[in-house]
Curated annotation (Swiss-Prot):
Source lineage: Bacteria, Pseudomonadati, Pseudomonadota, Gammaproteobacteria, Pseudomonadales
Site positions for Transition state stabilizer: K33, K255
Enzyme class, UniProt record, top EC level: transferase
Name this polypeptide is given: Acetylglutamate kinase
GO biological process: arginine biosynthetic process via ornithine; L-arginine biosynthetic process
Family, similarity comment: Belongs to the acetylglutamate kinase family. ArgB subfamily.
Organism: Azotobacter vinelandii (strain DJ / ATCC BAA-1303)
SUPFAM superfamilies noted in UniProt: Carbamate kinase-like (SSF53633)
Catalysed reactions listed for this entry: N-acetyl-L-glutamate + ATP = N-acetyl-L-glutamyl 5-phosphate + ADP
């Protein structure tokens, strides 16, 4: 393919802008939560795979954690198994857990691994059960109403939270030039499987690895103020204030709290980025403008 002169100049400008960022992040680990629209569009899937391969090629270490809620819901529907949710979490009985493992650990994980490898990477698929990668425990959910003297305990089945991450395994893979692709399934002390929110797994993996960045792909342009303007850079204190005044609410809260926990736990920065934008990951890392919201532990 021969580029026109103008196109060649544009490519050179892009590379020139990216070079300082490449130098800054060489040898660093970035944890990317992959989900939403970015997993559904063929164009976006291809762009994501190329982004990941390029990062590895220039010496950055990406670790991918993926979701798969819509795919789980589709298979449950085809199997005539009812999907039930409590506070946004899928109630996961033994039958549903079998489907979760089949979809996340099988179909979705292997599709992502295959796509990255087709574009020149060396991805390796994992669930949290492999070598005890994600040790988990049952998530306790309670509900309190004014008329209750004690909180109601709600059993949502095999839904878990992360207790620990096998960083030795991940570091071995990363240093061996592999790209880990992790399905958010944890394993309990008794060998029980647990369905865990992918954002939470990504956050805990980033925290355990002391990653440079945690990047959460979403279906929005980033965090917005009450006038609908994207907030491109925030400190943890500013995010806390936006939660307190109701600017951040609803379904975005768990994602933001995950980002806050990661940054306060040693991750240099967390990013809420627009996964609907082609090459969103590269744009956020390697350009001055980015495509989302950057959260750090620094003021301003």
């Amino acid at each position: 393919m021969t580029l026109s002169r103008d196109a060649a100049i544009q490519v050179a400008q892009v590379l020139s802008e990216a070079l300082p960022y490449i130098r800054r992040f060489v040898g660093k680990t970035l944890v990317i939560k992959y989900g939403g629209n970015a997993m559904e569009s063929d164009e976006l899937k291809t762009g994501f795979a190329r982004d990941i391969v390029l990062m590895k090629a220039v010496g950055i270490h990406p670790v991918v954690v993926h979701g798969g809620g819509p795919q789980i819901g589709d298979l449950l529907k085809r199997l005539s198994i009812e999907s039930r949710f409590v506070d946004g979490m899928r109630v996961t009985d033994a039958q549903t857990m079998d489907v979760v493992e089949m979809v996340l650990g099988g179909q979705v994980n292997k599709d992502i691994v295959n796509l990255i490898n087709r574009h020149g990477g060396s991805a390796i698929g994992l669930t949290g059960k492999d070598a005890g990668l994600i040790r988990a425990k049952k998530l306790k959910v309670t509900r309190q109403t004014p008329e209750m003297t004690q909180p109601e305990i709600i059993d949502i089945g095999q839904v878990g939270e992360v207790e620990s991450v096998n960083t030795e395994l991940l570091n071995m893979l990363v240093q061996g030039d592999f790209i880990p692709v992790i399905a958010p399934i944890g394993v309990g002390a008794d060998g029980e499987s647990y369905n865990i929110n992918a954002d939470l797994v990504a956050g805990k993996v980033a925290e355990a690895l002391k990653a440079e960045k945690l990047m959460l792909l979403t279906n929005i342009a980033g965090l917005m103020d009450k006038e609908g303007r994207v907030l491109t850079g925030l400190s943890t204190e500013q995010v806390d204030a936006l939660i307190a005044d109701g600017t951040i609410y609803g379904g975005m809260l768990p994602k933001i709290r995950c980002a806050l926990d990661a940054v306060q736990g040693g991750v240099t920065s967390a990013h809420i980025i627009d996964g609907r934008v082609p090459n969103a990951v590269l744009l956020e890392i390697f350009t001055d403008t980015g495509v989302g919201t950057l959260i750090t532990n620094r003021q301003g």
